[in-house]
């Protein structure tokens, strides 16, 4: 590659620190000055010092990587990865903690493709690709003597530390006050945020002691006292938030179909275990509650599906959302392939109606009592407009693009509400199918979303915000239950009691494990009656 110019290594590292500070860390600078704009008394010297401290800190962090043969590939990689992180932070206010790194690593190609748009490509080219290419086009001059190289680097680091110390002496109270009231700021510095989170994820995933696989409910027994077998549909939703459910008080009729099904109960105060699928799905199926949840333990442990299966129930998992996060690994699974159904699929993803295809044949092949779990794509963003067919474009105008921050709020909400309305249509179709089976089975449907979604409130989009910082839109989720008269009678359920509890009491994914076991009348030591949200209403 031709050499464009020559530069000494120490000034180059300082220049790189400045580029990262002013370009890729533009989101945190904006956040910092947004915070300061709401304070009554701000010292001008403190404001000016922020960028100097950021440059100095990055210079200290970067200096150890300024050695020959490492500098260019290392910083080229930082430019490329930092560019994507910077864009996501700037546009969606995404926070790159360990959970977000897990989400990225577990993302499938179809999901990753949905985030591509003109804006991110332009940003990536100018802040990631071009700087990386330019870096390889310069001639770096290193000190001839190794000890001079060490001495110059130490002097540069000491100068940066001295500047930081000087600023701290003058404005420590100001930094402490802002930091104390805005605890996420230190997690927004690029590349330290995602580099540290990636290190933690790799360490915890690949370099910690392997957790022995734990079986659950080996003592499980089920009392079968009904003439008819049971058929349960368990529907795991994607990215639906309670706030936009008309059954929960939303002004728009997003539950236009299930509201006409008759007997559908909506749980108005349901909360998720996490703010991302990678956490919420394994957590809701596990016997751990949210505060004690451990991903490693969950991935090396059985869940309530395994326990129900041990009691003789036939299980089937139908997957339309890119993967079950390990919860279906020990039960029969049907993976929906877009290539198999061009009518309901676009080659990459499928509309959730596809879950009803071949369902009757699949049920017929399952002996005895049956549980069919559906993992739907639901309201998966940012390409909300691809989640429903043309005939379900009810709320208009829609946001037919993936860079949703460039749509109007009306367009964005319209499109998201269309996804909920379409999911509601699919659920109503499932309920109708269960009604048709009610002569052969006692039937029941339970629908619950994995997490919610932000639609631009407070500048936040999508989901994945750390739970303790997440807004209600990302954690307050819908759950619906429908039961056939035969199921209600067989389980001795007081529906008035259940409706009252669903309207007034608060529940969460923590309740799902024991509630499902309870509905199946499973007796086991891991069943917790206090977490069974149906128990209080059973005679």
Predicted regions and their residues:
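Short, P/G- and charge-enriched loop/turn segments at secondary-structure junctions
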Residues: 220-222, 462-470, 499-501
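Conserved beta-strand->loop/alpha-helix structural units within folded catalytic cores of enzymes
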Residues: 237-239, 311, 423-426, 430-433, ...
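Active-site-proximal alpha/beta segments of enzymes that process anionic O-linked groups
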Residues: 168-234, 239-400, 476, 504, ...
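A long, amphipathic alpha-helix that forms part
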Residues: 189, 357-361, 399-443, 481, ...
